[in-house]
């Protein structure tokens, strides 16, 4: 059972503006979990009986372990666990981070519960993976829960609180990784530990992989799969991705999603050349000026809208879920548009009316983000070169990356700009475009799998007034090695968020609601329950 709230947690939740729904939409635990926790069964609990055993009889394989209290109550509290995770600075500046202390802490959590663990070393010192394996009762292919421990760096001066303190303010827990994705990790781990604490067993092995180098680096999940596939081979995978969206008030659950496809990630480099000279005699052909004009031209341009079967299903569910009639009407206009100009007009209206405009714009088209700019080296010298990197994400089944690249080159033609596709060393542009085409053509994960059915049923039980849908993830995950082998993978961030929290992902003051985390942990508990023996 969950540990009692800390004083800070109680104080902040009392002042929280989180909306709780009425009868039937409270997100309370189901009957078995209630029985497990209730004082009415305290005597039976002392004898090693769990809530499941009260309904279905004992499970002798783990009853003794559960009765012995092998799970620390603090480890089944997702807030307590998340605070510990956030206290470790696992920043990844581009070539991995120091994930060992975080892995050792989490290893201790699993060890206390009697779960087998292994820290997998990589060639980079202290940049490690952690694998925990909960043994199942059959030889069915395992369920893999995939959650990265590394996070992007912070701009400390722009945070309201210490990003490594796990502080709770006004019902929200702040910290780098609170949303992406230590929050999801804490929900998954604490939910599994609740099952173990009950003496529960699973009908297949459950592997929990806390990976490194998801944000960047050479030794992430692909390296791990190449070196140690036997440790992470699975029949299905759950990771980050699907958003739990709220109605316009920002807290009432509206749409629960599980992603089954990621956008296609690639980068473009724009280079400008100009006359280098003394800064006292500026010229219109300066490289920085030329690059700035090109960026200005591109930043005002949107790639065309492309709807795929995955995004059509998502937006149809969104139209049904929202309580905003004007927004629903705009979505239906988009879905029913018969020409490209009509789709573009409807998309503009839909995005303008959305409470999550940047998310919904990203699901429609290839996006461009200007992330790195380099030029100049001395204040009295006009440099001869300038460079900007553009991070791009293409819709699978929409516009091909090669066609987008051609469109960008066409937009800046005649501006003295070179556009290059960033690619791995030793790979030609043609070869890399072929690789991107292959990723672009990867089919979405099947909807008819035990994991997707478990996600759907957990959503219905935990958020009965919200809709559930599959979705496209606008970003990327560590799922590539499994998807390339035809293994279905899905993603969730199991907590309802508002748009401000979504924008803070990889930004400043990253945070999630404490109540949403707890309710999301109940969602994860119910999802794992579908795999109980």
Annotate each PLM feature.
Residues 1-30, 57:
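N-terminal secretory signal peptides
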Residues 35-54:
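N-terminal export signals
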Residues 50-66:
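C-terminal region of N-terminal signal peptides and the immediate post-cleavage residues
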Residues 64-67, 243-519, 525, 529-532:
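Metal-dependent amide/peptide-bond hydrolase catalytic core
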Residues 64-156, 385, 389, 401-403, ...:
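N-terminal helical capping/dimerization or prosegment-like subdomains
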Residues 92-93, 125, 138, 149-153, ...:
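Solvent-exposed loop/turn segments at secondary-structure junctions
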Residues 140-210:
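Active-site metal-coordination/substrate-binding segment of hydrolases
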Residues 210-236, 240-252:
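Hydrophobic, small-residue-rich alpha-helical packing segments that form membrane-like cores
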